[in-house]
Amino acid sequence: AGQPLIVHQMTALRAAGITELVINTGHLGVQLTSVLGDGGIWGLRIVYSPEPPDALETGGGIFQALPLLGSEPFLVVNGDVWTDYPFVRLPAAPVGLAHLVLVDNPSHHPVGDFSLRNGRVEETGAARLTFSGISVLRPELFANCAPGRFPLGPLLRRAMTDGQVTGEHYRGGWRDIGTPQRLAELDGELRRRHKEQRSNSPSIGD
């Protein structure tokens, strides 16, 4: 509450020792660059990967940004999620092509996305969880892709078929705030928490 979601994410990433960010920008590109700049005031180095007005979806956006990301595995955090996940827990180099953070299914997505069994993420299975939008990916995941608009999901599913996707189940705070209503609900909840914390804090003279 009180700060843009992306600033919350940036602060959490900085706390985990991550200092170099690539931000995909679409229709909000001008606003983002004017507010965030080069990231220096947060102790970060930000470079931007501008997307066309019709956007490229997650897969196409990452593929376009690959020259900025280098040849090593990289962390991806969707811009429309809030979480208190400790990013320092993530593997620097996944065993396979991808490592996904999965969470309990929210009410608006009760069927989930994938299953987790013995540390491997699978498309099939009875107990399904929701992909949080947090992942560590290897550039090789995009080896056969071409520039343009495409989703990330099919690439992950293909890698799952080959046993190349690991994962973990995070049970802490996570919210998909992809709609104005869900964003307003989260903001209200965080404001209530902040107010409760202040009222429970000892005052001088206690």
Region spans (language model):
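Well-ordered alpha-helical segments embedded in enzymatic catalytic cores
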Residues: 5-8, 61-64, 155
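Conserved beta-loop-beta/alpha segment of the NTase-like Rossmann-fold superfamily
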Residues: 33-34, 38-112, 116-118
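N-terminal glycine-rich phosphate-binding loop and ensuing alpha1 helix
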Residues: 1-32
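Short, flexible loop segments at the rims of nucleotide/cofactor-binding pockets, characterized by
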Residues: 1, 51-55, 145-146
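Short conserved AdoMet
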Residues: 1, 18, 37, 69-70, ...
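Catalytic-core segments of class I nucleotidyltransferases/pyrophosphorylases
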Residues: 18, 75, 82, 88-93, ...
